[in-house]
């Protein structure tokens, strides 16, 4: 019985504690559409900045922009994984300088639950954080 205990202790000592896991990542789904077909400018956050100073120094590094043709039956949908969606989840859609913008709509869902929705003429912003 003594050798079994010694063997178990050796196995524990050799393997050591389990490796530390990274932060829990949340599925964040952005959805944007408009009342009429329109080429929208969409900015979104797809990664957690390491800290606010890095984000503040160059926010566009962490907020890609795409142009997407959206409409009532043609939403733009993207799911990203963020560790801190309460700080960093954000999507905004704008009409740029168009003289005839549609009404934009956005939703932001975290782990399948819609937590923010918004709409507006010329653009819409969905974020958990007040900017």
What label would you give each PLM region?
Residues 21-56:
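Short, surface-exposed binding/anchoring microloops in extracellular/periplasmic proteins
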Residues 45-98:
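Mature extracytoplasmic domains of secretory-pathway proteins
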Residues 18, 28, 124:
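A broad, low-specificity signal marking well-ordered, structured residues that form hydrophobic/aromatic
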Residues 14, 24, 38, 100-102:
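Short loop/turn segments at connectors of secondary-structure elements within structured domains
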Residues 75-128:
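Extracytosolic low-complexity repeat regions of secreted or lipid-anchored proteins
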């Amino acid at each position: 019985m003594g050798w079994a205990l010694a063997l178990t202790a050796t196995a524990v000592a050799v393997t050591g504690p389990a490796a530390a896991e990274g932060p829990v990542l949340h599925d964040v789904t952005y959805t944007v559409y408009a009342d009429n077909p329109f080429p929208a400018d969409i900015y979104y956050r797809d990664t957690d900045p390491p800290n606010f100073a890095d984000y503040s120094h160059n926010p566009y590094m962490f907020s890609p922009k795409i142009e997407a043709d959206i409409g009532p039956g043609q939403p733009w949908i993207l799911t990203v994984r963020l560790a801190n969606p309460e700080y960093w989840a954000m999507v905004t859609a704008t009409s740029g300088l168009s003289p005839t913008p549609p009404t934009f709509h956005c939703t932001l869902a975290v782990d399948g639950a819609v937590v923010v929705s918004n709409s507006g003429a010329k653009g819409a912003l969905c974020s958990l954080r007040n900017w």
